[in-house]
Amino acid sequence: MTSSRPRLTSEPSDVPDGEQAQDPRTREEQAKNVCLRLLTVRARTRAELETQLTKRGYPDDVSARVLDRLTEVGLIDDEDFAEQWVRSRHLNAGKGKRALAVELRKKGVDDEVISSALADLDPAAERQRAEQLVRDKLRRERLDGTPENDVKVTRRLVGMLARRGYNQSMAYDVVSVELANERERRRV
């Protein structure tokens, strides 16, 4: 199936290719334009932008100067990016601390910045989000009261939380409590 939207490609002025981009100022201007275009789509880390510039063939010195300037004017801010990412992915995708740390590392965020961003995540809020995820899933589960079914449901729900980056002991505790609550709710 083909998309009706035109595919975005690099404009000729964005790609350095020997003759066209010999002047360092021109190269820097082109690299800056690439970064600005990428930043208009969504916030990005310095490492993500550096990767894009390298992929497009810009020399390291040009990339470093452009990225330093964008950082200096506040368009690149890994700390702010990490805080926004943690808040957004925790609330919208239900991710736990471990999964969030992995995602930020993949985006090239420094471990110290990751630790700082995750420190803002309240353990009570993390547990609350896990409880909500389990409650939402439990409403769709068939609970027949047999031990085999309970084990299967518990395993499935703990696995779901583990894949989202929640601590296994907390996940098991949340599932146990919410499973008991759901059984009680269905009895009434």
Swiss-Prot record:
Keywords: Cytoplasm. InterPro entries: RecX_HTH_1st (IPR053926), RecX_HTH_2nd (IPR053924), Regulatory_RecX (IPR003783), WH-like_DNA-bd_sf (IPR036388). It comes from the Bacteria. Residues 1-30 are annotated as: Disordered. Modulates RecA activity. Belongs to the RecX family. NCBIfam families: PRK00117.3-1. This is Regulatory protein RecX. The lineage of its organism: Bacteria, Bacillati, Actinomycetota, Actinomycetes, Mycobacteriales. The gene is recX.
